[in-house]
Swiss-Prot record:
Subunit structure: Homodimer.
Family assignment from sequence similarity: Belongs to the adenylosuccinate synthetase family.
Function as written in the Swiss-Prot or TrEMBL entry: Component of the purine nucleotide cycle (PNC), which interconverts IMP and AMP to regulate the nucleotide levels in various tissues, and which contributes to glycolysis and ammoniagenesis. Catalyzes the first committed step in the biosynthesis of AMP from IMP.
UniProt subcellular location: Cytoplasm
Species assigned in the record: Sus scrofa
Annotated GTP binding sites: 42-48, 70-72, 337, 363-365, 445-448
The organism's taxonomic lineage, starting at the top: Eukaryota, Metazoa, Chordata, Craniata, Vertebrata
Known tissue expression: Predominantly expressed in the striated muscle tissues.
Enzyme Commission (EC) number: 6.3.4.4
Pfam families (alphabetical): Adenylsucc_synt (PF00709)
Annotated positions binding substrate: 43, 331-337
Biological pathway: Purine metabolism; AMP biosynthesis via de novo pathway; AMP from IMP: step 1/2
Cofactor: how bound: Binds 1 Mg(2+) ion per subunit.
Protein name: Adenylosuccinate synthetase isozyme 1
InterPro entries named in the record: Adenylosuccin_syn_GTP-bd, Adenylosuccin_syn_Lys_AS, Adenylosuccinate_synth_dom1, Adenylosuccinate_synth_dom2, Adenylosuccinate_synth_dom3, Adenylosuccinate_synthetase, AdSS_1_vert, P-loop_NTPase
Length: 457
């Protein structure tokens, strides 16, 4: 082999691409996406913020999770519940995109769409694009999810409290490189069927009591394949075109929340995907320089579904009042949510990871009847204040919360539509949160409807 490099083998720096062009391309990163993320344990009201921003968006995307998420949106007095579909699907002028980081249960997708069609959702299938690289959730994944919870309860006396939607088992299949994707379903169905049978057998060998109708599921999946075929695109190319074509407003709807993140959440009581800002890049196939605004959504108090440490939880009349006034029941599971005071250690931790550019503070009106409002501002461990959020559950359960007590406003805020309409004590509460976290509050929620979000700047 000759030691002389052929002219077409030389690297770009040797003259294949002009340096000025490289510099220009580096400067032109394309459009930037706006990201909406949960800053607590979920159920913060992300769907409402997304719905607000989606009114003038061109593309609304989901980047992770599956139909374990639960977003409620109220439009014209109608309440829509979304689990897998981006809640921006209501916007008839926008495209909704399910990215490669999402795990898709096809029966659940169509069931959800049909339920919302009865409430007024129209022509959703014409506005939905699904990444060909998204992994699939199968019925046996959901069955295994339930079996694993039963095993945990029997062996450890407690379970994780999953939604039993098959999300964890589906992501496990993905991580084990055994999962099946949308592109597999739409290619050679015989090959897909063979891999599906093998995957089902693997799960049956691990869970001998697992009962699954393999051939029945394959028959249904073949039907679903034809229904979704018109919606499926190469997701990476779709996003690249969207970012580098004519300027577009692109919105990313995060599911779950920071403390449910598989890497940064309160393990093991977490979900199985990255629901922090890094999941946007890996779940859509976009580079970090295309991340623009990152909005953190935080409830004016704290809630959690299922088990796990909860430092500011109020197992008393205050907790009951928050649960009752806030109608704190899980959208996906119907389970009662645990309630407590706002925890700023959690919020600061979520900000460290996500770099929020602004916050949306929701459900302020739920605090309207309280004489005083407490806010958790720091943790102590063995009598010493700690500056970090503990990774270990046992340690988190032992922390002592230091509270600041603020005066309540004892005024109905549900009619407020601008900053000046809020009582001075409510304004002070909002400023207190801003000052302690170091991030400005852009929206304040005082009710269910779209117009009950007060925009501050």
């Amino acid at each position: 082999m000759s030691g002389t490099r052929a002219s077409n083998d030389r690297p770009p720096s040797a003259g294949g691409v002009k340096r000025g062009r490289l510099q220009h391309e580096a400067a032109t990163t394309g459009s930037r996406v706006t990201v909406v993320l949960g800053a607590q344990w979920g159920d913060e009201g992300k769907g409402k913020v997304v719905d607000l921003l989606a009114t003038d968006a061109d593309i609304i995307s989901r980047c992770q999770g599956g139909n374990n998420a639960g977003h409620t949106v109220v439009v014209d007095g109608k309440e829509y519940d979304f689990h897998l579909l981006p809640s921006g699907i209501i916007n008839t002028k926008a495209v909704s995109f399910i990215g490669n980081g999402v795990v898709v249960h096809l029966p659940g997708l169509f069931e959800e769409a049909e339920k919302n069609e009865k409430k007024g959702l129209k022509d959703w299938e014409k506005r939905l694009i699904i990444s060909d690289r998204a992994h699939l959730v199968f019925d046996f994944h959901q069955a295994v999810d339930g079996l694993q919870e039963v095993q945990r309860q029997a062996q450890e006396g407690k379970n994780i409290g999953t939604t039993r939607k098959g999300i964890g088992p589906a992501y496990s299949s993905k991580a084990a490189r055994a999962g099946l994707r949308v592109c597999d379903l739409l290619s050679d169905f015989d090959e897909f069927s063979a891999r599906f049978r093998n995957l089902a057998r693997q799960h049956q060998s691990m869970f001998p009591t697992l009962e699954t109708d393999v051939e029945g599921q394959l028959k249904k999946l073949k039907g679903f394949a034809e229904r979704i075929r018109p919606m499926v695109r190469d997701g990476v190319y779709f996003m690249y075109e969207a970012l580098h074509g004519p300027p577009k407003k692109i919105l990313v709807e995060g599911a779950n929340a920071a403390l449910l993140d598989i890497g940064f959440g309160t393990c093991p009581f977490v979900t199985s995907s990255n629901c922090t800002v890094g999941g946007v890049c890996t779940g859509l196939g976009i580079p970090p320089q295309n991340i623009g605004e990152v909005y953190g959504v935080v409830k004016a108090y704290t809630t959690r579904v299922g088990v796990g440490a909860f430092p500011t939880e109020q197992i008393n009349e205050t907790g009951d009042l928050l649960q009752s006034r806030g109608h704190e029941w899980g959208v996906t599971t119907g389970r009662k949510r645990r309630c407590g005071w706002l925890d700023l250690m959690i919020l600061r931790y979520a900000h460290m990871i996500n770099g929020f550019t602004a916050l949306a503070l929701t459900k302020l009106d739920i605090l309207d009847t309280l004489d005083e409002v407490k806010v958790g501002v720091s943790y102590k461990l063995s009598g010493k204040r700690i500056p970090y959020f503990p990774a270990n559950q046992e340690i988190l359960q032992k922390v002592e919360v230091e509270y600041e007590t603020l005066p309540g406003w004892k005024t109905d805020t549900t009619g407020a539509r601008k900053w000046e309409d809020l009582p001075p004590q409510a304004q002070s509460y909002i400023r207190f949160v801003e000052n302690h976290v170091g991030v400005a509050v852009k929206w304040v929620g005082v009710g269910k409807s779209r117009d009950s979000m007060i925009q501050l700047f």
